[in-house]
Amino acid sequence: MQLIRWVLLPSLTSALVVIGLVQACRWIAGVSPRLGLLVAAGLGVRVAAALGLFWISYLHLPILSSLQNGPGFWRMALDSQGYYRLAVYGAEQGLSTIPPGASSRTYVAALALWMSLTGTSVFSGVVLNLCCYVGTCALLIAVLRGLPARWFERTAMVSVAALSASPMLLFVSTQVLKDSFFLFFAVLLNAGVWLLAAPMAERASSAWKRMALGVPAVVAAIVVTAGVRGYYPAIAVVACGFLLISLILRSRRHYLVVALAAALSLVAGAGALRLGSEAGMAYFRVLTSIRTPADVMKTLRGARGAFIVAGGATNVADGLGDAGAIGAHRDTDSVAGVAEAMSIGVATMFVPLTLLQALSIVHVSGGGAMRALGDIDTVCFDIMMVATAVMTWRLRREVRGNAPYMVFSISLALMLTVLMAYIVTNVGTLVRLRLMLAVPFWTMTFAFARLPRLVGGDAIDQPNEVFDRRGATTAGSIGTKQV
């Protein structure tokens, strides 16, 4: 029985996983050969990097010895050992053995289930990351196929290239870390919101079918993300509030249906947040306890203070080289203090740290490898933002967009930027958390995509239709008008 459980079953499951990854890449290549090549290249680089890093650390080879952290692990991913050990114990002894207060319990439980099928090797966690990477690429491409034909490939290339080429995401994909898993469900959340935000120009039957897909996607995504990073779905729920306001203000047809869909998603999201985990519920309690602007600042200062107290080699100090984190010795209760801390935080998010140090704006005492990786990732992130902005601007000149979804995407990006810039003072943590901010940019062009056909439903807008600025079609004969 043990032979079947821990040898034959993992071998069979691993073979099926490989077949699934190959088929997914073939499907993407069938949609666009260039996209297929890009995704396959990203997958190949991740496999090669994961194998190299694993064996270097496992065999204690004399390569980057100071960064190695045991058999198969690295110091730049300290929490990976904790996730791995909890998941192995859960796979062997049952999920009930995972402590209720465990960090990112939903991810640990998912990893334990995965290891019970594929084996308890460290590399099993990496294979899960590879599946999440390919799945995220496929999800982006599936939605963006609704763009006009001549815009689809170039737009999808921007999003998929940003996902595939992010140095930080590439690194965390090679470790037993939660980021790839989390980002898949974060993109799923945006896809679900896109489905819910689209029906205002469609017949009621098509709108209900979109809702039948969108609400479960939003609920599932919130349940999972609440158990990984509980603050993210809380922020997304607030962004959905802005989307709902936009829908009500703009819609002229079926506005009650659209408002009901958005309201249902918010209610379901709140319930899902409660079910997600105790950690997720803790963030929800904080959110609902806020009554005044003073409560907001008190909560944010408390979160920021936790990073300041934690310290660390990559905690940012001011240009004078103070030992504390940025703003630790300043009066951040004042408007000027908050503005100064915020401006330094924004600079740290979007400007390479080496340049900030050269200008004496910030100072860090250590973390050389993480700083180098962070600088490269910052440059790539900036390029991605500019490319997305240019593509969005060009699309809006020719394709009728979904303004409510754009409101959601922009408000989500702005809230994430403001909160991370003020709260997170540790550069190493900030660079990893910045991957959350990439999600609204990867998915921003969803606003211009349409579903050509719903399961079992009538054709809606053809994917190759191009709309003029007034909303009339210039290709095809549907002639849908903007409402």
Predicted feature descriptions by range:
Residues 101-112, 117-135:
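Loop-to-helix entry region of an early transmembrane alpha helix in multi-pass inner-membrane enzymes
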Residues 27, 146, 154, 201-213, ...:
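Membrane-interface helix-loop-helix junctions at transmembrane boundaries of multi-pass membrane enzymes
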Residues 31-37, 205-215, 248-264:
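Membrane-interfacial entry segments at the cytosolic side of transmembrane helices
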Residues 170-171, 204-230, 236, 241-244, ...:
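Membrane-interface alpha helices of multi-pass inner-membrane proteins
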Residues 123, 140-165:
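Transmembrane-helix signature of polytopic, membrane-embedded enzymes
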Residues 19-25, 127-149, 383-387:
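Transmembrane-helix motifs of polytopic, lipid-linked glycan transferases
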Residues 56-86, 95-110, 120, 352, ...:
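Extracytoplasmic catalytic/substrate-binding loops of multi-pass membrane glycan-assembly enzymes
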